[in-house]
Design a protein with these regions (language model features):
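Non-transmembrane, aqueous-exposed alpha-helical and coiled segments at domain scale
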Residues: 1-458
Length: 458
């Protein structure tokens, strides 16, 4: 069977931990979109592993696959694999030959384009890792794919075609002399070719490349379980998110089919688990109607003074939850749980169950709020508008719940062990979304998650 893990919010919901939690019955774990811009943290036996490209299941000895929907920076991939090996692990990672490759010029252009956008206050808040420019080349039919790295002649043809275009973009559009760059070789045909060729040689030496769709179909035919792992979250999906403050791919469940080579019916007949953080976080610009205080340079109109109580609450949640970007280290904007956002995510993905993380972070507060609806143009709405401009005009309406105390979270083994007010909060969310809760996270380690149901249960 297949189980698809999808972030229901804006990323950073704790998907890696849930993949790890439910990973035992899975034989193969597949990343179906994104690149090394999406950090995820896995804790195994008290040891923390921070990864941005290698699938989470690799920490537990599962076969990891980077699907054709991913964009792959081989340098990052090799660095993470070598790091895991240095720590005594033996990751088995396969890379789709149809996946596109992030090359040095992509990273340079990503930073330049974001800087240009910032001058017009339209910066998206990218990580500068070349993700967007690589997907642009994919759509523009000028990309270099993993399979191209394995054929010297094809690779040379691809590089000779695309690199002069990138150099012209740099010099003629952005007005930057290539020799003024820290890495001018990023726009040199021979240098790019040699770098890419070295990537291909190592991929071939370690027998890492596969036709992902065929590979996964064969695994399923042999009776193996496949878990599909999305990066980021539904609300930054390029089609279903708050455009233009989105990523360049589809983290939603539909992307699991196109990004892996498995049929939509295969994905749809399996379980689709939505990962929810018990509060809301965001890195970068864009609407956040339930936001507490703000982050300068990210929250529109925020000047660093939202009032002592709200600032204190936002800082408390941010610090208790470690809400700083895994890749960038940037502070995340924080807010109360947003049900209009989750209703949209539930509809788009067809969640069969929810895993709610970080319930422990909210412990000790006198009250906990949930944004249950918005007011827009004098009317109450229950889901997010289709345009970002309208979403930015929404004012959140809140339901208030009594807070729950700090407890010994290590002693919370069953759902009934959770504080009563926390259960009330969770049951409200489940009822509003008409979706069962499969798991509740009360800490970072796998054994700090209360499992109500496994998606692999009959």
């Amino acid at each position: 069977m297949t189980v698809t893990i999808v972030g229901s919010q804006l990323g950073d919901e704790g998907k890696g931990g849930v993949v790890d939690l439910y990973g035992d019955p899975a034989d193969v774990v597949v990343r179906y979109q994104g690149g090394d811009n999406a950090g995820h943290t896995v804790v195994e036996d008290g040891t923390e592993y921070k990864l941005s490209l290698v699938p989470s299941g690799a920490v537990r000895g599962k076969v990891g696959v980077l699907g054709n929907g991913c964009v792959v920076n081989p340098a990052t991939l090799f660095e993470e694999m070598d790091g895991l090996r240095d720590r005594g692990l033996d990751p088995d990672v396969r890379v789709a030959e149809r996946a596109h490759v992030i090359l040095p010029y992509h990273r340079v252009l990503d930073g330049i384009e974001e800087e240009v956008k910032s001058e017009t206050d339209s910066a998206v808040g990218t990580t500068g890792r070349g993700i967007g420019p690589t997907y642009e080349d994919k759509a523009g039919r000028r990309g270099v794919r993993v399979g191209d790295l394995l054929d010297e002649d094809v690779l040379r043809e691809r590089v000779e075609y695309v690199v002069p275009q990138k150099r012209a973009l740099l010099e003629d559009v952005y007005g930057i002399d290539v020799e003024d760059l820290e890495n001018p070789d990023a726009f040199d045909v021979d240098a790019v070719y040699e770098t890419a060729l070295e990537y291909g040689e190592r991929l071939a030496e370690e027998d890492m490349t596969v036709d992902a769709g065929t590979f996964l179909a064969e695994k399923r035919a042999a009776g193996e379980n496949v878990m599909l792992e999305g990066a980021q979250g539904t609300i930054i999906d390029i089609d279903h998110g708050n455009y233009p403050y989105v990523t360049s791919s589809n983290p939603t469940a539909g992307g699991a089919a196109t990004g892996s080579g498995l049929a939509p019916t295969v994905v749809g007949q399996g379980e689709i688990v939505g990962i929810v953080k018990a509060y809301l976080t965001r890195v970068g610009r864009g609407p956040l109607p339930t936001e507490l205080a703000g982050v300068e340079g990210q929250t529109p109109g925020y000047d660093g003074d939202a009032g002592d109580a709200e600032e204190e609450l936002a800082t408390y949640i941010r610090d208790e939850g470690g809400e700083y970007g895994t890749v960038t280290g940037r502070p995340r904007r924080v807010g109360w749980l947003d049900l209009p956002m989750l209703r949209h995510s539930t509809r788009v993905n067809g969640f069969t169950g929810l895993a709610v993380n970080h319930v422990d972070v909210l412990a000790g507060l006198d009250e906990v709020k949930v944004g249950d609806t918005y007011t827009l143009d004098g009317e109450v709405v229950e889901t997010i508008p289709s345009t970002t401009e309208k979403w930015a005009e929404c004012e959140a309406n809140f339901e208030t719940f009594e807070g729950w105390p700090e407890v010994d979270w290590d002693a919370v083994d069953e759902y009934e062990d959770l504080p009563a007010n926390a259960r009330t909060y969770l049951e409200y969310v489940s009822e509003e979304l008409d979706t069962d809760i499969y798991a509740v996270g009360v800490g970072p380690d796998r054994d700090q998650t209360v499992v109500l149901e496994s998606p692999y249960d009959d």
